From Swiss-Prot:
The keyword Lipid metabolism belongs to this UniProt entry's keyword annotation: yes
Organism placement in taxonomy: Eukaryota, Metazoa, Chordata, Craniata, Vertebrata
Signal peptide coordinates: none
The gene coding this protein: elovl6
EC number(s) given by UniProt: 2.3.1.199
Name of the protein in its database record: Very long chain fatty acid elongase 6
Organism: Danio rerio (Zebrafish)
Subcellular location, principal: endoplasmic reticulum
Length: 266
């Protein structure tokens, strides 16, 4: 089946990707401003909340998580279908190197929606601050760096972006659905939380693999449009995520389990 045979919705067909890419090329540096404001809000919010009782915010959190879950599920279905078709009809190299993900049917809207969504997703942290929950380094570091890198990369339509975005849509579809269920009061097995973290770790490994393939094909003189600077920043980002998520997995599920087992045996 041809990629062009994928059914487009009217809003996808009407989307002007040239205008979107042009806007990002002119405005991508605003991601630094958003990141600075985000950091300031975290520091200011935590300072203010020291003197206040925590907010419950259960219903707003359910609505927030459901909205992001629905967006991610729809995005995963649309971009996933597109990438599978590219992979099946044109092969692995084309699925990694082809820039059509940014301007082709179906995916062009979801590529732009993805990078824009990284700004409002910063709102995740607002719930942590207002509910006076533990805010770990991984959380805010991940939010800031994903925002900066996605805006920086979209403007250049770099190779590998289709896989980066599709993987993130898939992981977020599961993650935000889990958050919504937890916020709604459903009891979810701890193993499911472990599964989500493992999918995140897998995503980081795959991100590094994609970066390696892009670099390899570039060095071989094949058409795989990116630049070394982008590959370096992307690889450092994915490697840092890999280390931090592995550390989180070990501390949250391995160390804590051993600690609980030791307490029960006393």
């Amino acid at each position: 089946m041809s990629v062009l045979a994928l059914q487009e919705y009217e809003f996808e067909r009407q989307f002007n990707e040239d205008e979107a890419i042009r806007w990002m090329q002119e405005n991508w540096k605003k991601s630094f401003l958003f990141s600075a404001l985000y950091a300031a809000c975290i520091l200011g919010g935590r300072h203010v909340m020291k003197q206040r009782e925590k907010f419950e915010l259960r219903k707003p959190l359910v609505l927030w998580s459901l909205t992001l879950a629905a967006f991610s599920i729809f995005g995963a279905i649309r971009t996933g279908g597109y990438m599978v078709n590219i992979l099946m009809t044109k092969g692995l190299k084309q699925s990694v190197c082809d820039q059509s993900f940014y301007n082709g049917p179906v995916s062009k809207f979801w590529a732009y929606a993805f990078v824009l969504s990284k700004a409002p997703e910063l709102g995740d942290t607002l719930f942590i601050v207002l509910r006076k929950q533990k805010l770990i380094f991984l959380h805010w570091y991940h939010h800031i760096t994903v925002l900066l890198y996605s805006w920086y990369s979209y403007k250049d339509m770099v190779a590998g972006g289709g896989w980066f975005m599709t993987m993130n849509y898939l992981v977020h579809a599961v993650m935000y659905s889990y958050y919504a269920l937890r916020a709604a009061g459903f009891k979810i097995s701890r193993k499911f939380a472990m599964f989500i973290t493992l999918t995140q770790i897998t995503q980081m490994v795959m991100g590094c693999v994609v970066n390696y393939l892009v670099y390899l094909w570039m060095q071989q003189g094949q058409e795989c449009p990116s630049h070394v600077q982008n590959i370096v920043w992307s690889s450092l980002m994915y490697l840092s995520y890999f280390v931090l998520f592995c550390q989180f997995f070990f501390e949250a599920y391995i160390t804590k389990r051993k600690s609980n087992a030791a307490k029960k045996s006393q």
